[in-house]
């Protein structure tokens, strides 16, 4: 029996390519991390409507079955509310980029970047003036690539409005929206595209 046949058989047995079970398994492994639990609990306990999801590199790595070495999080709370939520649970943090909605929580020397949902008001080719939002699709729309706009809740259920998972699995690095417009918003996206292409293209 050849190796391709065995790989296909293993895929079928363990659902590795047919559904999202392996993704949920990956996020449930992260969930075992005490520090991660503390962050999620702090946000969820702040209000009945507060939501927090994984985003960015850690989601891509789980989908690609790679080791997760850092965790970025997105929340539907404004930065001040994130600070209040962390304070209530005695979690240390610093305002690493609060003008852009980013708070860095620090637990046992482990850093977690927590960023509020945003929408761009205007851009100048490098920086954007933002407003904070509670709309996940709106936040996803301002991101550069489809593979950078995949979110996952603590159980591993994906919010993937631009089919980034499919692009990631197919080795595609696609811009969200009009390429020319997105590059004019931030010219460094050209360099980011090259880096992502080298890392993820097939």
Can you say where each PLM-predicted feature lies in the sequence?
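Catalytic cores of the polymerase beta-like nucleotidyltransferase superfamily
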Residues: 2-202
């Amino acid at each position: 029996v050849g190796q391709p046949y065995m790989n296909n058989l293993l895929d079928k047995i363990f659902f590795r390519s047919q559904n999202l079970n392996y993704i949920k398994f990956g996020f449930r492994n992260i969930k075992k991390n005490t520090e991660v639990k503390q962050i999620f609990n702090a946000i969820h306990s702040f209000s009945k409507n507060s939501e927090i999801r994984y985003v960015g590199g850690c989601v891509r790595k789980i989908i690609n079955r790679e080791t997760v070495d850092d965790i970025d999080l997105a929340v539907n709370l404004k930065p001040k509310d994130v600070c209040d939520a962390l304070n209530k649970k005695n979690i240390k943090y610093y305002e690493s980029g609060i003008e852009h909605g980013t708070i860095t929580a620090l637990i046992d020397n482990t850093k977690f970047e927590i960023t509020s949902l945003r929408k761009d008001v205007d851009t100048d080719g490098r920086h954007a003036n933002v407003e904070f939002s509670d709309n996940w699709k709106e936040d996803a729309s301002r991101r550069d690539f489809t593979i950078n706009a995949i979110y996952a809740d603590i159980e591993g259920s994906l919010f993937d409005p631009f089919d980034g998972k499919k692009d990631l699995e197919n080795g595609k690095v696609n811009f969200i929206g009009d390429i020319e417009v997105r590059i004019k918003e931030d010219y460094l996206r050209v360099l980011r595209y090259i880096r992502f292409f080298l890392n993820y293209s097939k």
